[in-house]
Amino acid sequence: STIHTNNAAETITRILNMWVKAFLIPASVNAIIAQRLVKKLCSCKKEVNIKDIGEDIIKSVKNAINITDKQELSFRVWDKLKKPVFYKSVGCKKCDWSWYSWRTWIYEVLEITPWVKEMILSWSSAFNINRQAIKDWMISLEQDGVMKALNGLTSLEEIYRVAKSQKG
């Protein structure tokens, strides 16, 4: 089923607001996936000088990748964290000067862990459920997007254009 929310945790509060009894959610849901489509950079991309990226974006990136004890997050970008390189497109005939070609997706998977289950049963806020899910090793939309930007699939600007609505 599809429920339009900004992140996976908001799905729980949306269901609760539809007067579904709280005990039914963990009894019938194992995981919730939130996803967003992001534009992929064209092959005409070039490296961006870190100094040219806005300080607010750099701060957000540092916060997103600061949780380096996550095995999956570390495994996917560990070598790139030592000297991060981000890209932007310059435009060409192939992308019709739009800088992007096709799309890819960023996603997060919120598993209904025992801690999350307790929070659902006590009607915790989406913000607190999201925080707990991240403690329980969920990789957020923002973190997945930063990993894709570090791998040159998309730009930081695109990630923060799409993922900004899911913050706090």
Annotate the PLM regions.
Residues 1-168:
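Short, flexible helix-loop junctions that flank or precede catalytic/ligand sites
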